[in-house]
Amino acid sequence: MKFSPLLDEMMKALQVLPGVGPKSAQRMAFTLLERERSGGLRLAQLLNRALTEIGHCSHCRTFTENALCEICANPKREESGLLCVVESPADVAAIEHTGQFSGRYFVLMGHLSPLDGIGPEELGLEILEQRLKAESISELILATNPTIEGDATAWYIADMARAAGVKVSRIAHGVPVGGELELVDGTTLSHSLMGRQPLN
Protein backbone atom coordinates (compact mmCIF):
# COMPACT_ATOMS: atom_id res chain seq x y z
CA MET A 1 0.00 0.00 0.00
CA LYS A 2 1.23 3.46 -0.86
CA PHE A 3 1.33 6.08 1.89
CA SER A 4 2.27 9.72 1.74
CA PRO A 5 5.81 10.25 0.39
CA LEU A 6 6.93 11.69 3.74
CA LEU A 7 5.52 8.72 5.66
CA ASP A 8 7.26 6.33 3.24
CA GLU A 9 10.53 8.20 3.83
CA MET A 10 10.02 8.02 7.60
CA MET A 11 9.47 4.25 7.45
CA LYS A 12 12.55 3.74 5.27
CA ALA A 13 14.62 5.85 7.68
CA LEU A 14 13.50 3.74 10.65
CA GLN A 15 14.79 0.62 8.88
CA VAL A 16 18.42 1.69 9.40
CA LEU A 17 18.03 0.41 12.97
CA PRO A 18 19.09 -3.21 13.55
CA GLY A 19 16.22 -5.68 13.54
CA VAL A 20 13.72 -3.19 12.10
CA GLY A 21 12.11 -4.37 8.88
CA PRO A 22 9.25 -2.83 6.87
CA LYS A 23 6.46 -4.02 9.22
CA SER A 24 8.23 -2.87 12.41
CA ALA A 25 9.06 0.45 10.78
CA GLN A 26 5.43 0.92 9.77
CA ARG A 27 4.24 0.11 13.30
CA MET A 28 6.73 2.57 14.82
CA ALA A 29 5.83 5.33 12.36
CA PHE A 30 2.09 4.89 12.94
CA THR A 31 2.55 4.81 16.72
CA LEU A 32 4.57 8.04 16.67
CA LEU A 33 2.03 9.78 14.46
CA GLU A 34 -1.11 8.43 16.16
CA ARG A 35 -0.24 8.51 19.87
CA GLU A 36 3.30 9.69 20.53
CA ARG A 37 3.88 12.91 18.60
CA SER A 38 5.46 14.67 21.59
CA GLY A 39 7.64 11.62 22.28
CA GLY A 40 8.58 11.48 18.60
CA LEU A 41 9.60 15.14 18.61
CA ARG A 42 11.70 14.59 21.75
CA LEU A 43 13.29 11.53 20.12
CA ALA A 44 14.08 13.55 16.98
CA GLN A 45 15.67 16.34 19.05
CA LEU A 46 17.76 13.89 21.10
CA LEU A 47 18.85 11.96 18.01
CA ASN A 48 19.93 15.19 16.35
CA ARG A 49 21.78 16.34 19.46
CA ALA A 50 23.43 12.95 20.09
CA LEU A 51 24.55 12.50 16.48
CA THR A 52 25.94 16.04 16.47
CA GLU A 53 27.59 16.15 19.91
CA ILE A 54 28.72 12.60 20.70
CA GLY A 55 32.21 11.77 19.49
CA HIS A 56 35.00 9.52 20.67
CA CYS A 57 37.07 9.61 23.86
CA SER A 58 40.57 10.78 22.95
CA HIS A 59 42.07 8.08 25.17
CA CYS A 60 39.99 4.90 24.70
CA ARG A 61 37.83 5.75 21.64
CA THR A 62 34.45 4.91 23.24
CA PHE A 63 31.48 7.24 22.78
CA THR A 64 31.37 10.45 24.82
CA GLU A 65 30.46 14.10 24.40
CA ASN A 66 33.60 15.14 26.32
CA ALA A 67 37.31 14.91 25.48
CA LEU A 68 37.61 12.03 27.98
CA CYS A 69 34.90 9.54 28.89
CA GLU A 70 33.98 9.05 32.57
CA ILE A 71 36.05 5.87 32.81
CA CYS A 72 39.25 7.44 31.44
CA ALA A 73 38.73 10.54 33.59
CA ASN A 74 38.57 8.39 36.75
CA PRO A 75 42.07 8.11 38.32
CA LYS A 76 41.06 4.96 40.25
CA ARG A 77 40.64 3.11 36.95
CA GLU A 78 44.29 3.79 36.10
CA GLU A 79 45.51 2.42 39.44
CA SER A 80 44.42 -1.13 38.57
CA GLY A 81 46.93 -1.28 35.72
CA LEU A 82 44.44 -3.29 33.65
CA LEU A 83 43.58 -2.40 30.06
CA CYS A 84 40.80 -4.29 28.27
CA VAL A 85 40.61 -4.24 24.47
CA VAL A 86 37.11 -4.58 23.00
CA GLU A 87 35.59 -4.28 19.55
CA SER A 88 32.79 -1.79 20.29
CA PRO A 89 31.35 0.60 22.87
CA ALA A 90 28.54 -1.96 23.36
CA ASP A 91 31.20 -4.38 24.65
CA VAL A 92 32.33 -1.76 27.20
CA ALA A 93 28.72 -1.47 28.39
CA ALA A 94 28.39 -5.27 28.68
CA ILE A 95 31.60 -5.61 30.73
CA GLU A 96 30.73 -2.62 32.92
CA HIS A 97 27.32 -4.18 33.60
CA THR A 98 29.03 -7.19 35.24
CA GLY A 99 30.69 -4.96 37.87
CA GLN A 100 33.75 -7.27 37.73
CA PHE A 101 36.23 -5.03 35.92
CA SER A 102 37.86 -1.94 37.43
CA GLY A 103 40.41 -1.07 34.75
CA ARG A 104 40.35 0.96 31.57
CA TYR A 105 39.44 0.13 27.98
CA PHE A 106 40.58 0.54 24.41
CA VAL A 107 37.80 0.33 21.81
CA LEU A 108 38.82 -0.87 18.36
CA MET A 109 35.56 0.05 16.61
CA GLY A 110 35.75 -3.23 14.71
CA HIS A 111 38.21 -6.04 14.01
CA LEU A 112 40.88 -6.81 11.44
CA SER A 113 39.24 -7.69 8.14
CA PRO A 114 41.58 -7.24 5.15
CA LEU A 115 38.85 -8.20 2.67
CA ASP A 116 36.76 -5.28 3.94
CA GLY A 117 39.75 -2.92 3.93
CA ILE A 118 40.01 -2.84 7.73
CA GLY A 119 43.63 -2.98 8.81
CA PRO A 120 45.58 -1.90 11.91
CA GLU A 121 45.30 1.81 11.04
CA GLU A 122 41.49 1.72 10.90
CA LEU A 123 41.39 0.14 14.37
CA GLY A 124 43.69 2.75 15.91
CA LEU A 125 46.33 0.16 16.78
CA GLU A 126 49.11 2.74 16.55
CA ILE A 127 47.39 4.60 19.42
CA LEU A 128 47.16 1.36 21.42
CA GLU A 129 50.83 0.63 20.74
CA GLN A 130 51.78 4.07 22.09
CA ARG A 131 49.71 3.44 25.22
CA LEU A 132 51.38 0.06 25.76
CA LYS A 133 54.80 1.72 25.65
CA ALA A 134 53.99 4.91 27.57
CA GLU A 135 51.60 3.81 30.32
CA SER A 136 52.03 1.57 33.34
CA ILE A 137 49.91 -1.36 32.17
CA SER A 138 50.27 -4.54 34.22
CA GLU A 139 47.99 -6.65 32.02
CA LEU A 140 46.30 -6.29 28.65
CA ILE A 141 43.03 -8.25 28.49
CA LEU A 142 41.85 -9.10 24.98
CA ALA A 143 38.05 -9.24 24.87
CA THR A 144 37.47 -9.38 21.13
CA ASN A 145 34.62 -11.53 19.85
CA PRO A 146 35.19 -15.30 19.51
CA THR A 147 35.09 -15.17 15.70
CA ILE A 148 37.82 -15.81 13.14
CA GLU A 149 38.32 -12.05 12.75
CA GLY A 150 38.17 -11.47 16.50
CA ASP A 151 40.76 -14.18 17.13
CA ALA A 152 43.05 -12.83 14.39
CA THR A 153 42.76 -9.36 15.89
CA ALA A 154 43.54 -10.72 19.37
CA TRP A 155 46.67 -12.52 18.12
CA TYR A 156 47.88 -9.39 16.32
CA ILE A 157 47.44 -7.26 19.44
CA ALA A 158 48.98 -9.96 21.66
CA ASP A 159 52.16 -9.76 19.56
CA MET A 160 52.18 -5.98 20.04
CA ALA A 161 51.75 -6.36 23.80
CA ARG A 162 54.52 -8.94 24.11
CA ALA A 163 56.86 -6.70 22.10
CA ALA A 164 56.12 -3.90 24.60
CA GLY A 165 56.79 -6.25 27.55
CA VAL A 166 53.16 -6.22 28.72
CA LYS A 167 51.47 -9.35 30.11
CA VAL A 168 48.57 -10.32 27.87
CA SER A 169 45.52 -12.54 28.41
CA ARG A 170 42.36 -13.45 26.48
CA ILE A 171 38.90 -13.69 28.01
CA ALA A 172 37.65 -17.26 28.40
CA HIS A 173 35.20 -18.72 25.91
CA GLY A 174 33.07 -21.73 26.49
CA VAL A 175 29.94 -23.31 27.81
CA PRO A 176 27.41 -20.74 29.03
CA VAL A 177 26.30 -20.91 32.66
CA GLY A 178 23.18 -23.05 32.84
CA GLY A 179 23.90 -24.55 29.41
CA GLU A 180 23.66 -28.25 28.61
CA LEU A 181 26.67 -29.88 26.93
CA GLU A 182 24.60 -31.78 24.38
CA LEU A 183 23.23 -28.46 23.05
CA VAL A 184 26.60 -26.68 22.79
CA ASP A 185 28.20 -26.49 19.34
CA GLY A 186 31.48 -28.31 18.72
CA THR A 187 33.64 -25.19 18.37
CA THR A 188 32.45 -23.76 21.67
CA LEU A 189 32.93 -27.10 23.40
CA SER A 190 36.48 -27.35 21.97
CA HIS A 191 37.29 -23.87 23.32
CA SER A 192 35.89 -24.91 26.69
CA LEU A 193 38.07 -28.01 26.85
CA MET A 194 41.21 -26.13 25.79
CA GLY A 195 40.54 -23.29 28.24
CA ARG A 196 39.68 -25.46 31.23
CA GLN A 197 40.63 -24.17 34.69
CA PRO A 198 41.96 -26.16 37.65
CA LEU A 199 39.70 -26.47 40.69
CA ASN A 200 41.66 -25.36 43.75
Swiss-Prot record:
Protein keywords: DNA damage, DNA recombination, DNA repair, Metal-binding, Zinc, Zinc-finger
Residues in Toprim domain copies: 81-176
PROSITE patterns the record matches: TOPRIM (PS50880)
Pfam families hit by this protein: RecR_C, RecR_HhH, RecR_ZnF, Toprim_4
Molecular function terms from GO: DNA binding; zinc ion binding
Domain of life where this protein originates: Bacteria
Zinc finger (C4-type): 57-72
InterPro entries in the cross-refs: DNA_Rcmb_RecR, Rcmb_RecR, Rcmb_RecR_Znf, TOPRIM_dom, TOPRIM_RecR
Biological process according to GO: DNA recombination; DNA repair
Family: Belongs to the RecR family.
NCBIfam families, per the entry: recR
Function text: May play a role in DNA repair. It seems to be involved in an RecBC-independent recombinational process of DNA repair. It may act with RecF and RecO.
Protein known as: Recombination protein RecR
Organism of derivation: Aeromonas salmonicida (strain A449)
